[in-house]
């Protein structure tokens, strides 16, 4: 579908996302960030389904912390933010000629979006993150839905450990960036398993 898009930039959105008119006016400022080697610009999400109960409020709070504090730290000083899904904006011309925005496979790539970001870093690109703009997103409001999402993310991290792309990526990192990458991905789930 990337080849049918027009313009120089491409925004990836899910079906459960919404963009607001006021935020659309900020998009011009965001697109000015594509200078030099910047290939992905990410920004935060506002969970509009947080009023659906205690589980929905917990999921929205979890997403808020990941979308603001964690991604800000992953961008700088840790330098390990990749493409974590939506609503990132891509340099469309770059991703058309360098492998696309993700790598979908039914068996291996459960969390397919991170491989697009790893491809950017492997090819010398830069990932930025801005907080002055946000996009609306609806989350599951049932316990089973939230639990299923967490299982999908944890399973995707397990499959990432086995991937050839992330093996290549970690070979090009220094020691401190490698520790940051480990603790922001599979190390998070391993440390939680050890602590419980």
Positions of predicted regions on the chain:
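Membrane-embedded multi-pass helical conduit in multi-pass membrane proteins
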Residues: 193-196
């Amino acid at each position: 579908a990337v080849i049918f898009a027009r313009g120089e930039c491409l925004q990836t959105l899910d079906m459960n996302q919404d963009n607001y008119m006021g935020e659309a006016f900020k998009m011009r400022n965001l697109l000015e960030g594509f200078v030099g080697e910047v290939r992905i610009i990410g920004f935060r999400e506002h969970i509009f389904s947080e009023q659906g109960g205690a589980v929905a409020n917990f999921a929205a709070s979890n997403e808020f912390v990941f979308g603001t504090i964690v991604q800000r730290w992953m961008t700088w000083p840790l330098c390990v933010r990749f493409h974590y899904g939506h609503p990132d904006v891509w340099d469309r011309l770059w991703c058309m000629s360098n492998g696309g925005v993700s790598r979908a496979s039914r068996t291996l790539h459960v969390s397919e979006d991170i491989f697009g970001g790893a491809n950017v870093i492997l090819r010398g690109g830069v990932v930025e993150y801005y907080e002055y703009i946000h996009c609306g997103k609806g989350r599951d409001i049932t316990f089973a839905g939230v639990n299923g999402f967490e299982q999908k993310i944890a399973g995707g991290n397990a499959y990432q450990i086995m991937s050839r792309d992330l093996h290549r990526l970690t070979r090009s990192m220094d020691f401190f960036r490698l520790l940051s990458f480990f603790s922001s991905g599979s190390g998070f789930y391993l440390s939680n398993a050890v602590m419980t």
